[in-house]
Swiss-Prot record:
Lineage of the species this protein comes from: Bacteria, Pseudomonadati, Pseudomonadota, Gammaproteobacteria, Enterobacterales
Domain remarks: Contains two well-defined domains connected by a flexible linker. The C-terminal domain may serve as an important protein-binding surface for interaction with other Bam components or substrates. In addition, contains a long unstructured N-terminal region, which is required to stabilize the BamCD complex. Only the N-terminus of this protein is observed in the Bam complex in X-ray or EM structures, most of the protein must be highly mobile.
UniProt KW keywords: Cell outer membrane, Lipoprotein, Membrane, Palmitate, Signal
Family to which this protein belongs: Belongs to the BamC family.
Lipidation (S-diacylglycerol cysteine): 25
Name the UniProt record assigns to this protein: Outer membrane protein assembly factor BamC
Gene name tied to this protein: bamC
Organism: Escherichia coli (strain K12)
Amino acid sequence: MAYSVQKSRLAKVAGVSLVLLLAACSSDSRYKRQVSGDEAYLEAAPLAELHAPAGMILPVTSGDYAIPVTNGSGAVGKALDIRPPAQPLALVSGARTQFTGDTASLLVENGRGNTLWPQVVSVLQAKNYTITQRDDAGQTLTTDWVQWNRLDEDEQYRGRYQISVKPQGYQQAVTVKLLNLEQAGKPVADAASMQRYSTEMMNVISAGLDKSATDAANAAQNRASTTMDVQSAADDTGLPMLVVRGPFNVVWQRLPAALEKVGMKVTDSTRSQGNMAVTYKPLSDSDWQELGASDPGLASGDYKLQVGDLDNRSSLQFIDPKGHTLTQSQNDALVAVFQAAFSK
């Protein structure tokens, strides 16, 4: 018992220590670029010749274990930057990236046509980057100074860029060339910084293009799901049903609201089985007129609805209060009713 209590206390102490450690590490991300530990190694005494006491015979020396003397000229201590080289990200579907010198490139498929250049310009304008020169015919522009703000820098950088879109074989190349780079007002030209801040701008553009593509896809899906076509059909046994042009997930999500519009209230549902129980109360003549459909002539009562998954379509089959499927004429009458309900 004592062992268990002691073990529990140790676990709690270890957990608290871990939380404090993570909090300390995340409080200032500048330390991600520095070697862990203190800088006592900078004060270490240099290597010295070994002097043996009088009368002691030392083994024969061997050059195999000699430590060479070096005169390092690189950065040490907090001046040492251990961050890996920055890499441009191919966030756009089907794209790839490359980096050469001071230029980062994003190669995308030609399918975007003439929309790529306006999208690149829109990304920069959305970020409020000032454009000093712009040639839409040549699809090239030059920015004013872009101020960067990174937590892993002691002094912030700013850069001027030339950005262009050019055909390259069967692809289009979005190119970012770093024209000037400064840190705290002083010019910077080291390879690591040039790569990091060329890549910084490229990744901003890449993320913006990816967001545009995602927004366009979502808008297209919303348009498709807003106007879902409804048709009369029959199942494998010849019983009437409705077929909605829309995937099961979309139809299932929109069904309760659509049913409510036609006078059917959902009282129970099981998504995994595609079952719904609804109570039907016919609408008034004015409500049918407002919906834009005619009264299908169904009797009041409790109905069961079976929703089927037909890949990019869904089936709706109603069972009346007496346990029978709807007649063909009743099913056909519901086509216009649900077409109107899904469209509103």
